[in-house]
Design a protein with these regions (language model features):
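Sec/Tat signal peptide C-region and signal peptidase I cleavage site
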Residues: 17-23
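N-terminal Sec/ER secretory leader and immediately downstream segment
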Residues: 23-130
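Secondary-structure edge/capping motif, primarily at the C-terminal ends of alpha-helices
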Residues: 90-97, 116, 120, 155-159, ...
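Short, charged, amphipathic alpha-helical segments
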Residues: 103-107, 127, 167-170, 192-199, ...
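A cross-kingdom marker for long, charged
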Residues: 214-270
Length: 270
């Protein structure tokens, strides 16, 4: 059986523009044609990314679940980062075809989105997520999650919260990378691990983080995350044409797991 691996950029549907020279994505021409483009950077949609890597066997997606995170964050930057991570969790639950987990994650997504003051359009999607999960409509759930994250970002932009849009995307990238690297470690082969090579994407994220307001950039959590991106870029810059070694994937997983723990820690960023 062949399966799809959730890739590290699972929720990186960035809203903004910055031209960089991106490396070719490991996708077919048809998949690339469907990708979302931001100037010269091509960002594949989650569906295309899931199809980018296939290998025998079925992953234990339920094994990539994490314990529920707090829903009582007060700091908006921390909420945005965790919202991105939750959206990635939603895609993982869909891959696991776990209706109850999808509903649980969907409820939490709406709670954090509401804390950021998003539009009623976003909040109403909670019912759709529950309905599709109840009926095991996995393709529809994929589309609904993508629509939800896009509406979250659109709503933030309309409220002049572009900086928070970046943080939502970053939170999704970190959580997605954690899940993918863990899945690769569990059943390692070099070909599958190549999906983790994405220095252009990390460089793009880092450049967008440098564009956020000085006030937000000075917050302890945001500063820590931004400082660690330089190391992340090195960890995903494997030799061209070769996949990473198991040890390299483990180092990447350790780094993103540590960062994810910092993001979801209950103490609010100051």
């Amino acid at each position: 059986m062949r399966f799809r691996i959730v890739t590290a950029a699972v929720t990186w549907l960035a809203c903004g523009s910055l031209a960089i020279a991106a490396e070719p994505a490991p996708l077919s021409q048809e998949q690339l044609a469907k990708a979302i483009k931001i100037d010269s950077l091509t960002i594949p949609t989650p569906g295309e990314l899931f199809a980018a890597l296939e290998k025998p066997g079925k992953p234990d997606w339920a094994g990539q679940y994490r314990t529920p995170i707090p829903m009582t964050y007060r700091n908006r930057a921390q909420i945005a980062l965790n919202l991105g991570g939750l959206i990635a969790d939603g895609f993982i639950a869909v891959e696991a075809q776990d209706s109850q987990q999808v509903k649980n994650i969907g409820t939490d997504i709406i709670k954090l989105a509401k804390a950021l003051g998003v539009s009623e359009n976003v909040l109403s999607r909670g019912n759709s997520i529950n309905e599709f999960a109840e009926n095991s409509e996995w393709d529809a759930l994929h589309e609904e999650l993508e629509a939800t994250q896009n509406e979250v970002k659109t709503s933030m932009q309309s409220h002049q919260d572009q900086d928070l849009v970046i943080l939502v995307s970053l939170g999704g990238w970190i959580r997605g990378t954690q899940a993918v690297s863990a899945a690769v470690i569990k059943n390692f082969d070099e070909q599958s691990a190549k999906v983790l090579r994405q220095p252009a994407v990390v460089g793009f994220i880092h450049s967008k983080m440098n564009d956020i307001s000085a006030e937000l950039k000075s917050e302890a959590l945001v500063k820590s995350v931004n400082d660690q991106l330089a190391n992340m870029e090195k960890l995903v810059a494997f030799q061209t044409g070769k996949g990473p070694t198991l040890e390299e994937v483990k180092k990447l997983n350790d780094a993103v797991s540590k960062l994810m723990d910092e993001i979801q820690k209950k103490e609010d960023a100051k």
